[in-house]
């Protein structure tokens, strides 16, 4: 067979198949980008607080992280096309509920839970369906197209979501997703299923429950740490032994994950299919690749939670203006991810990833300089662009590292672990860095009020009491309304507003500092990434679907 024949599409409807898969990829990527630039509008529409929307965003990523591997196993058992179809139907139901959501609870059920479950079925099946419908060069080209569509979704998402949110309503984005999913379902009949090798795997429901519960407790404890406190209790529902429940909840999650690993080994000893073959995690390159995927998305999604708070709440920009100012991250990340594979051949993935981490640290240092009461728009855009370069360098390497570290039979499982690491990073980024911002806001505000001679002792005491029940990230008009409602003298009210504004910037900078610190610590995780020698030997050409740009949100 000639190269041309080997690269030919599996059937005459290949273009329609590729369009179908590309549409699904775009829908999966679009969601979180829209939510990130709509935070302040969601707070206003549902009359809630930033921390509540933070929880909704975190839950979305957590559901996907907890169910991604199980979703892949269900695809292996049902058939990838059937899992893809069922996932899309569940996703469309979630989008429809989100579009008409009347409360935060409905939003969480529709977006975080139903869309998260649907995505956990769609995403593992999507990559397998490419392999089932394309061969040779056509398959590599299809993966490249999907990578490009995902990158375009990251770039377009903040602009599209911001414009629709500002000029119409964010609900239309999710209504539009329902229409897109219906179109995908119609086109799906032209697609052939991915072939299944061997007998369908046995489902490990106990393992799924243990892993999902463990991850949930760890993320929940991290998310609530800003409210409950890490050690000393602040606004905690319970106080075990007089301490905050945060570490107890996280430790409980760790215990469940330990039980999960024991259960997986037990199933393997019995000759039954485990949810995850733990021996794969002994592969150094795979382990490092997964750790770096986790770190990359923790940093990126944490910063993507911070930036809208600064732009919308501190600066007063609307969602569209916020999307425009965050656009350089997406553009430079996408562009650099296209160029990154070329660098790997010269320097090796390890060095390219380390350079990316250095660039991220530099961008965090730059953010510390530009997060001021009066924004320097040019400087802010430059720093955002630099951040995208660092992220793009990392993203360009890790997909190929993970896929090249296992054989053909292990690529499906490696892909599931990769998506789990990405979504867990997204959940932890929003939870951890968001908790540091909220906790830092309370701590800094109290310190500044106590040090301000214009604030009376009685008011200082009252502020301390109020902070025990939590603090909200308020815009200037909201803060002014709260001060007016308290009936304070004008001079004292002005002093409180000034202290609160300073505390907001201190809290945001604390979150940026944590992101930079995580980038520095992540150098440890690069140790087992392949260097140039290995890249030349066996990873120089990306395996199908492993190279090229990989969206950070998928």
Enumerate the predicted regions with their spans.
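Transmembrane-helix exit segments and adjacent C-terminal regions of multi-pass membrane proteins
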Residues: 1-21, 262-266, 400, 442-443, ...
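Interfacial helix-cap and linker-helix signal at transmembrane-aqueous boundaries
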Residues: 42-43, 74-75, 160-168, 222, ...
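Flexible interhelical linker loops that connect adjacent transmembrane helices
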Residues: 8, 185-215, 228-242, 266-284, ...
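C-terminal module of multi-pass small-molecule transporters
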Residues: 79-88, 97, 102-109, 122-128, ...
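Transmembrane core module of solute transporters
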Residues: 14-64, 68, 169, 241-248, ...
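Structural signature of transmembrane alpha-helices in multi-pass secondary transporters
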Residues: 28, 57-60, 64, 91, ...
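C-terminal membrane-cytosol helix-exit motif in multi-pass small-molecule transporters
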Residues: 178-196, 214-227, 252-268, 522-530
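Helix-loop-helix hairpins in multi-pass membrane proteins, especially solute transporters
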Residues: 74-215, 224, 241, 247
């Amino acid at each position: 067979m000639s190269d041309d024949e080997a690269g030919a599409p599996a059937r005459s409807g290949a273009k329609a198949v590729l369009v179908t898969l590309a549409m699904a990829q775009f829908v999966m990527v679009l969601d979180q980008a829209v939510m990130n630039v709509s935070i302040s509008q969601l707070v206003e529409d549902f009359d809630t607080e930033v921390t509540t929307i933070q929880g909704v965003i975190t839950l979305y990523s957590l559901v996907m992280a907890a169910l991604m591997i199980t979703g892949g196993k269900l695809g292996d058992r049902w058939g990838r096309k059937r899992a893809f179809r069922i996932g899309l139907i569940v996703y469309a139901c979630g989008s429809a509920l989100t579009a008409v959501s009347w409360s935060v609870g409905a939003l969480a059920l529709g977006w975080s839970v139903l869309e998260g479950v649907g995505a956990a079925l769609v995403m593992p099946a999507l990559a397998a369906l490419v392999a089932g419908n394309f061969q040779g060069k056509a398959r590599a080209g299809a993966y490249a197209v999907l990578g490009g569509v995902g990158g375009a979704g990251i770039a377009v998402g903040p602009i599209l979501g911001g414009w629709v949110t500002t000029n119409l309503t964010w609900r239309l984005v999710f209504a539009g997703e329902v229409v897109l999913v219906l179109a995908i379902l119609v086109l799906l009949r032209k697609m052939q299923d991915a072939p299944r090798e061997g007998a369908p795997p046995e489902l490990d429901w106990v393992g799924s429950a243990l892993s999902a519960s463990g991850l949930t407790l760890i993320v929940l404890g991290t998310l609530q740490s800003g409210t409950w406190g890490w050690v000393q209790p602040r606004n905690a529902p319970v106080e075990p032994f007089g301490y905050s429940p945060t570490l107890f909840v996280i430790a409980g999650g760790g215990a469940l994950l330990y039980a999960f690993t024991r259960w997986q080994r037990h199933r393997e000893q019995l000759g039954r299919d485990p949810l995850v073959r733990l021996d794969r995690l002994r592969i150094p390159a795979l382990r490092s690749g997964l750790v770096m995927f986790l770190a990359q998305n923790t940093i990126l999604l944490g910063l993507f939670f911070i930036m809208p708070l600064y732009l919308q709440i501190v600066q007063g920009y609307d969602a569209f203006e916020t999307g425009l100012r965050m656009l350089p991250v997406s553009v430079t990340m996408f562009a650099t991810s296209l160029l990154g594979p070329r660098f790997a051949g010269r320097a090796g993935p390890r060095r390219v990833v380390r350079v990316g981490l250095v660039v991220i640290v530099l961008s965090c240092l730059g953010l510390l300089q530009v997060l001021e009461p009066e924004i320097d728009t040019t400087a802010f855009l430059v720093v955002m662009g630099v951040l995208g370069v660092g992220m793009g360098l990392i993203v360009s390497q890790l997909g190929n590292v993970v896929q090249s570290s296992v054989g053909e039979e292990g690529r499906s499982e490696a892909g599931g672990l990769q998506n789990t690491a990405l979504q867990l990073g997204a959940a932890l980024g929003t939870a951890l860095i968001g908790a540091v911002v909220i906790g830092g806001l309370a701590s800094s505000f109290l310190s500044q009020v106590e040090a301000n001679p214009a604030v009376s002792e009685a008011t200082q005491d009252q502020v301390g009491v109020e902070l025990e029940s939590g603090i909200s990230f308020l815009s200037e008009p909201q803060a002014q309304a709260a001060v007016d409602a308290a009936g304070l003298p004008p001079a004292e009210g002005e002093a409180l507003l000034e202290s609160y504004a300073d505390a907001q910037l201190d809290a945001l900078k604390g979150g940026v500092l944590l992101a930079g610190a995580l980038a520095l610590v992540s150098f440890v995780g690069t140790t087992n990434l392949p260097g140039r020698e290995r890249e030349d030997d066996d990873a120089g050409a990306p395996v199908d679907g492993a190279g090229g740009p990989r969206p950070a949100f998928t």
